[in-house]
């Protein structure tokens, strides 16, 4: 949960040769320790972040980096991870150090310890960390003269020894990188004696007192460097901020996020579950969840038909050769389920009469859509051809990264593949992006930015020229949208660059939603052609597009965005009748029948519970419209509206109530209904 960072770009300052960056910051009158915008590091002309103790050999112009910026927070969190590691090794001397990087909104550190950490251990560690912070220990950078010196010093730290020779470029490995091998020592501020140290490339804040606010949040198991074949370590997570106020805001957001967790709400609202008997990452939707999912799909299906898409269906498994042709088995095999060897025939003595072949669960729909295109000759008059499918795919996600509906192993993509001419590409991309943004907006997501993922130089197919053309087309369309564009170097799939539409939810969290990917490679691999207007055979361009990402993921995101209180048009139960007493049930059933005639999903609660308990229950179930009826309502042919925010409208004529509910649903209002928003005339 991200508390907004300061985006202002401070003016550069000059650091004279032979003086520290800290002195230049002080002379410039910039904020120091204690202020939320205190300068914690500087960025030099090459873009490298430098400690405030850095002394340039020649005059240097640097940009101050404040604590309340993304970069400043990252430095604070990295330093907090060091303080955590120091506390762990003081309280648990047998602990061996793994890695401890800053991450979004926090930090973690991995440790090899005999027993998992307990909540009581975290309390003790946090207490010791506060003491270290209060001591004001200095972070002091030291350069190793050689790798041999580093190895000798780190002889008791096997995981650090492994990192001395690391050349992976993994951004989570803060220990090494750059031209030098360095350590950061924590020094006693009075004696300058080394208290603790760690292999690290930095940078760091000047002293531990520059960590104004932090908290340890949890611990878990984690494989060394994320590989399940490696040792299992214990990971401690924490968060650190530039002020206590920012930390408190963050913790409130975490608490709210936990309240909105779709896995929790899925159980409470009886929407979906993950039975152990089926397997990790494989969801089943219950009747109420099935209603929401159906409404999500049906509205999307209607909008796609209006936009000129043609619906197709493809099987869940296919022969291995298809994924050899597409390149998936060359580049994506680790993300696929193991093959099934089928079709072999044997003689009675076991001799193979006909060899079998491998089949795979499909991880993507695109190869099959190319076969639909290729099934007959195509003319330029048919292009653009927009194929669309709710296609279920299967990906072998590691168990440690599976997370409810938002990271599953089996899911249904709202998958489209568009085949067009090169001349049509720009217009098709522009209209496609507009379509994506409008449709997501219809579901209540309106705060967007774009991410442009470009070629991974070590993992791509096709020529540089083709990649450049595709990337330029996407960049131009992104610029025309007027939305913020964030670069993602090396983030593209192996077959083409892409634009990702990122949406911010009600808590300000960013979610990757739609992807739009240009692909010149698949048409080559599958030898796709069309007859051009001059009679020549030409290659089409292929555009991959998943608007929701997957139905399951979008379901999970919307569940959290709305905290389970889905808009009435999506809600599994749109209205419920709550009688004051049993004798009022028949009247409410007649109101319900009237609503059902308009297609409203309505129930009447005829249980033995008291009315107050029924209201509490249906409020917890997030039913948008509760209709109450007692003697006066029945006599007047009216109902009383009750809403989730506890507001109420009494004595509404039943026809007016029905009209109001039907209109609210038909208009696809995404706000939560209340006495203030629902326009009806009260009979009182």
UniProtKB/Swiss-Prot annotation:
Its cofactor is Zn(2+). Keywords: Aminoacyl-tRNA synthetase, ATP-binding, Cytoplasm, Ligase, Metal-binding, Nucleotide-binding, Protein biosynthesis, RNA-binding, tRNA-binding, Zinc. GO terms for cellular component: cytoplasm. Binds 1 zinc ion per subunit. It comes from the Bacteria. It catalyses: tRNA(Thr) + L-threonine + ATP = L-threonyl-tRNA(Thr) + AMP + diphosphate + H(+). SMART domains: tRNA_SAD (SM00863). Its EC number is 6.1.1.3. It holds the Pfam family tRNA-synt_2b. Gene3D superfamilies: 3.30.54.20, Anticodon-binding domain, Bira Bifunctional Protein, Domain 2, Threonyl-trna Synthetase, Chain A, domain 2. HAMAP family: Thr_tRNA_synth. Belongs to the class-II aminoacyl-tRNA synthetase family. Catalyzes the attachment of threonine to tRNA(Thr) in a two-step reaction: L-threonine is first activated by ATP to form Thr-AMP and then transferred to the acceptor end of tRNA(Thr). Also edits incorrectly charged L-seryl-tRNA(Thr). Homodimer. This is Threonine--tRNA ligase.
């Amino acid at each position: 949960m991200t508390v907004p960072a300061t985006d202002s770009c401070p003016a550069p300052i000059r650091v004279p040769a032979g003086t520290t960056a800290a002195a230049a910051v002080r002379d410039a009158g910039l904020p120091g320790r204690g202020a939320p915008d205190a300068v914690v590091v500087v960025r030099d002309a090459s873009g490298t972040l430098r400690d405030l103790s850095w002394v340039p050999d020649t005059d240097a112009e640097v940009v101050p980096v404040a604590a309340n910026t993304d970069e400043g927070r990252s430095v604070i969190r990295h330093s907090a991870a060091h303080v955590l590691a120091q506390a762990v090794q003081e309280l648990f001397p047998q602990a061996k150090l793994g890695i401890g990087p800053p991450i979004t909104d926090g930090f973690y550190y991995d440790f090899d310890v005999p027993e998992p950490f307990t909540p009581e251990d975290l309390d003790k560690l946090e207490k010791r960390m506060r003491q270290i912070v209060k001591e004001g220990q200095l972070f002091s950078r030291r350069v190793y003269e050689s790798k041999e010196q580093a190895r000798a010093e780190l002889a008791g730290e096997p995981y650090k020894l492994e990192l001395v020779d690391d050349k992976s470029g993994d951004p989570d490995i803060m220990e090494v990188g750059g031209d030098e091998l360095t350590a950061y020592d924590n020094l006693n501020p009075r004696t300058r004696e080394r208290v603790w140290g760690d292999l690290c490339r930095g940078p760091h804040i000047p002293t531990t007192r520059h960590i104004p606010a932090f908290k340890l949040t949890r611990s878990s198991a984690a494989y060394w460097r994320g590989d399940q074949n490696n040792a299992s370590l214990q990971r401690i997570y924490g968060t650190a901020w530039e002020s206590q106020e920012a930390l408190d805001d963050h913790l409130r957001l975490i608490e709210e996020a936990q309240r909105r967790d779709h896995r929790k709400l899925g159980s409470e609202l009886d929407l979906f579950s993950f039975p152990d008997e089926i397997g990790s990452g494989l969801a089943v939707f219950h009747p109420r969840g099935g209603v929401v999912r159906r409404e999500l799909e049906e509205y999307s299906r209607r909008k796609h038909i209006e936009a000129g898409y043609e619906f197709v269906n493809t099987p869940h498994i296919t022969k291995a050769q298809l994924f050899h042709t597409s390149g998936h088995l060359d580049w994506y095999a680790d993300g696929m389920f193991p093959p099934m060897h089928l079709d072999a025939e044997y003689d009675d003595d076991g001799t193979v009469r006909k060899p079998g072949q491998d089949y795979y669960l499909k991880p993507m729909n695109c190869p099959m859509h190319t076969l639909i295109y290729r099934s007959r000759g195509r003319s330029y008059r048919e292009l653009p051809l927009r194929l669309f499918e709710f296609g279920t795919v299967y990906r072998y996600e590691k168990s440690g990264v599976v997370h409810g509906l938002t990271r599953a192993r089996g899911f249904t993509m709202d998958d489209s593949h568009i085949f067009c001419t090169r001349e049509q590409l720009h217009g098709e991309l522009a209209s496609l992006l507009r379509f994506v943004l409008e449709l997501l907006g219809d579901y209540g997501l309106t705060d967007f930015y774009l991410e442009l993922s470009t070629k991974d130089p070590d993992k791509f197919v096709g020529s540089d020229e083709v990649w450049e053309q595709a990337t330029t087309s996407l960049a131009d369309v992104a610029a025309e949208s007027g939305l913020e564009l964030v670069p993602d170097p090396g983030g593209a799939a192996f077959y083409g660059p892409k634009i990702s539409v990122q949406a911010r939810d009600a808590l300000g969290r960013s979610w990757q939603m739609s992807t739009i990917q240009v692909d010149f490679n698949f048409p080559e691999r599958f030898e796709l052609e069309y007859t051009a207007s001059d009679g020549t055979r030409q290659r089409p361009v292929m555009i991959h597009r998943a608007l929701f990402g997957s139905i399951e993921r979008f379901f999970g995101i919307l569940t959290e965005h709305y905290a389970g209180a889905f808009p009435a048009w999506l809600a599994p139960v749109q209205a419920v009748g709550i009688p004051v007493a049993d004798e009022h049930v028949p009247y409410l059933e007649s109101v319900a029948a009237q609503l059902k005639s308009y297609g409203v999903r309505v129930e009447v609660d005829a249980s033995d519970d008291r009315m107050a308990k029924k209201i509490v229950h249906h409020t917890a179930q997030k039913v948008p419209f509760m209709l109450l009826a007692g003697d006066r309502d029945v006599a007047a042919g009216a109902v009383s509206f009750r809403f989730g925010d506890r507001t109420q409208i009494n004595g509404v004529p039943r026809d007016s109530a029905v009209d109001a509910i039907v209109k609210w649903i038909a208009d696809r209002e995404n706000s939560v209904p209340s006495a203030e928003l629902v326009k009806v005339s009260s009979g009182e």
